[in-house]
């Protein structure tokens, strides 16, 4: 079937012989009609983002930027004049989320050099390139955790206004922490006392951040941490906090942090018993909702592979939107990945991941897919599918659960599930499609064939068809 064409007949209604190829048709789901452009995705196996079985021979109708109906061939007709896009032989699923990205960095190994050389280009070049790279990799939404306040807000808003392509960003602005590291004051804000903590959170909330990023809370006073969390919640902002050290977790749990990030910088083989007990106590309090955790494991799991197979770094997709001198500088910084200080403890940390991941699952946290993309060798074009692959292929998570951790649950965590997170009538048409069976071969997500965000097709480029 041709990939795309303008359907001129009155309706598309596939015969019973075709219908027999799939499951019995579910009830057609519809949203109120509107008057936008009409598109139909026809024929693929749909993973809605819920936990139900796949929908074979699916039909998804898109009216403008939102989904108007979901059904199957033979039970859902395609309106006259709609553009029909064949998804035959593909898995169709909600656009992916990456719940931990850094758009101000794009894989360079030397942060100090990067900040000094490229900070003036963060807003105009680096962050837009990162957001576009995420989108073209099938990541239609991302949580950007740590960046200059004004640049983060401006890039997010330009994307939302349709002025440039990119993943929809949910931004934290600067890290809130005990004190900024040297020469990082533009995107790391220190707090000195509870009053200052309240003031800093009020400032970023007033600027329009979506979430508050708290780190090094074990170095802060209890009253400072409480001030950050309470002020954020007072202003309707969830708090995301580092979980690198045990005391960071203890303080975050006791004071109401909503989501923890990472699995820890230490090489201890497991989380201490008291922390697991505290997590269990928190997850048992159903009235508080889920306790979220973004483990960001693929960078650790894949380091040795990338170190020993440097051709994997040659994928030109991560160059997109970056001037050649910046690409060349990134390449130079990665010439000797085995020497990078960033990864010297990776060999000792890597064996702890499976145990910690299992502990978190058994303690009842709701795990989210996030990658720390932008850190050394961790390009925005590759990290999200690798995280999903690591969950499924290395850690034994079933594919549907992993996919929901990158679609449904992030939308719930960010309180935008009325608009995104599943392929459902009335929600934004954030949809991707991949040739082949993703439930059997999760790594197929490394080559996304179709990317649609808010009803606009970005991959493949429609102007080339």
Positions of predicted regions on the chain:
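Bacterial N-terminal signal peptides
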Residues: 10-20
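Histidine-rich, glycine-flanked metal-binding segment
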Residues: 30-35, 46, 52-93
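Acidic/histidine-rich helix-loop elements
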Residues: 103-122, 178-195, 264-270, 338-345
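Active-site core of metal-dependent hydrolases
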Residues: 214-349, 368, 375, 395-396, ...
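His/Asp/Glu-enriched, well-ordered alpha-helical/loop segment
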Residues: 234, 337-344, 350-434
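C-terminal cap of metal-dependent C-N hydrolases
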Residues: 406-408, 425-465
């Amino acid at each position: 079937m041709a990939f795309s064409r303008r359907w001129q007949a009155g309706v598309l209604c596939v015969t019973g012989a075709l219908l027999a190829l799939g499951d019995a048709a579910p009830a057609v789901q519809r949203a109120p009609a509107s008057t936008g452009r009409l598109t139909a995705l026809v024929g693929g196996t749909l993973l809605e983002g819920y936990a139900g079985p796949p929908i074979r021979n699916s039909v998804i109708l898109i009216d403008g930027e939102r989904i108007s109906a979901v059904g199957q061939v033979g039970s859902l007709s395609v309106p006259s004049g709609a553009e029909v896009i064949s998804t035959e032989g593909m898995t169709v699923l909600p656009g992916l989320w990456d719940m931990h990205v850094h758009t101000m960095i794009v894989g360079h190994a030397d942060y100090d050099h990067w900040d000094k050389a490229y900070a003036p280009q963060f807003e105009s070049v680096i962050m837009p390139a990162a957001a576009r790279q995420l989108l073209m990799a099938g990541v239609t939404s991302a949580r950007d955790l740590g960046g200059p306040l004004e640049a983060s807000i401006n890039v997010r808003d330009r994307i939302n206004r349709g002025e440039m392509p990119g993943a929809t960003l949910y931004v934290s602005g600067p890290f809130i922490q005990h004190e900024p590291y040297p020469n990082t004051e533009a995107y790391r804000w220190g707090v000195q006392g509870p009053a200052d903590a309240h003031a800093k959170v009020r400032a970023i909330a007033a600027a329009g951040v979506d979430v508050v990023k708290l780190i090094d809370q074990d170095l802060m006073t209890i009253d400072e941490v409480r001030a950050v969390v309470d002020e954020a919640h007072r202003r309707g902002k969830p708090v995301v906090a580092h979980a690198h050290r045990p005391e960071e977790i203890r303080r975050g749990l006791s004071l109401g942090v909503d989501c923890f990030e990472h699995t820890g910088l230490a090489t201890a083989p497991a989380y201490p018993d008291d922390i697991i007990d505290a997590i269990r106590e928190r997850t048992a309090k159903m009235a508080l909702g889920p306790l979220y955790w973004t483990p960001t494991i693929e960078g650790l799991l894949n380091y040795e592979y990338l170190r020993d197979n440097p051709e994997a770094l040659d994928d030109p997709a991560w160059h997109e939107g970056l001037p050649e001198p910046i690409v060349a500088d990134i390449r130079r910084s990665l010439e000797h990945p085995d020497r990078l200080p960033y990864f010297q403890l990776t060999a000792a940390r890597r064996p702890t991941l499976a145990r910690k991941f299992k502990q978190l699952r058994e303690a009842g946290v709701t795990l989210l897919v996030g990658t720390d993309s932008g850190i050394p060798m961790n390009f925005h074009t590759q990290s999200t599918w690798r995280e999903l692959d690591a969950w499924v292929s290395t850690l034994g998570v079933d594919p549907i659960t992993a996919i929901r951790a990158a679609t449904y649950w992030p939308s719930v965590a960010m309180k935008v599930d009325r608009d995104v997170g599943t392929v459902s009538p009335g929600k934004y048409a954030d949809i991707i499609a991949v040739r082949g069976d993703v439930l059997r071969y999760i790594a197929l997500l490394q080559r996304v064939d179709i990317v649609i965000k808010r009803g606009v097709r970005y991959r493949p480029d429609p102007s080339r068809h």
